């Protein structure tokens, strides 16, 4: 077994005294072997549904995460406000792209993350996993060339477009890219 282990734990982070949303924790855990160390009896129905959907979606991407080539795109240690990585199959026909907002500023401008490891000649359809936004991303279901994605990346929104009572400082995205044949 070669995949990194990542688990989904408590909502409250003792080191930072902050509450980290379930979506963000799921997206981090999905970048390894998705594990959940939480009590279902303490979860709302909405949280249970989000976890069930994440498990189902993870089953689709698991071979790519566990056996694909890893590309570390932006390090959280660079303090640019974003961390990002992706996995790509050896055939370059499927990929999982991860994006996490790591810093919290007012009127911030986050860098656009260029992807890596894709085939320049292939076309890829983009689908967001674990979506919580009221509306899909502007590029949901659209097709882009590997050349474009590696030269430009995609414009990732800094925040989730959710109802007011669900807004918070954390934002994360998981994108599934699949070759269009």
Describe the function of each predicted region.
Residues 29, 97, 126:
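Conserved, mostly hydrophobic/aromatic
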Residues 36, 41-49:
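N-terminal leader/propeptide and maturation segments of large enzyme subunits in energy/redox metabolism
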